């Protein structure tokens, strides 16, 4: 009789462990899905950051070019004005 009770207890424990195991598998599966979604979001954000970086580089080049053009125009215009005033005298 005692052996049957022990067997029943062991069977109940085994059934409980199987249930807990299934629950843990479901939790792990849910965490994997969340992790996959987060990885995808990170990849999307990295792509957007790369595009922003490319646009920023283009803007910096444009501004640098505009500054160089303005300085060159000022120097050339000043030189022409000086030469013109020298020729007038």
From Swiss-Prot:
Record has Chloroplast as a keyword: no
Pfam families from the UniProt entry: XhlA
Gene3D superfamilies: 1.20.5.340
DNA-binding as UniProt keyword: no
First-listed, main subcellular location of the protein, grouped into a coarse class: membrane
Xref: InterPro entries: Haemolysin_XhlA (IPR019715)
Entry's family note: To B.licheniformis xpaF1 and xpaL1.
Function: Associated with cell lysis upon induction of PbsX.
Protein name: Protein XhlA
Taxon lineage: Bacteria, Bacillati, Bacillota, Bacilli, Bacillales
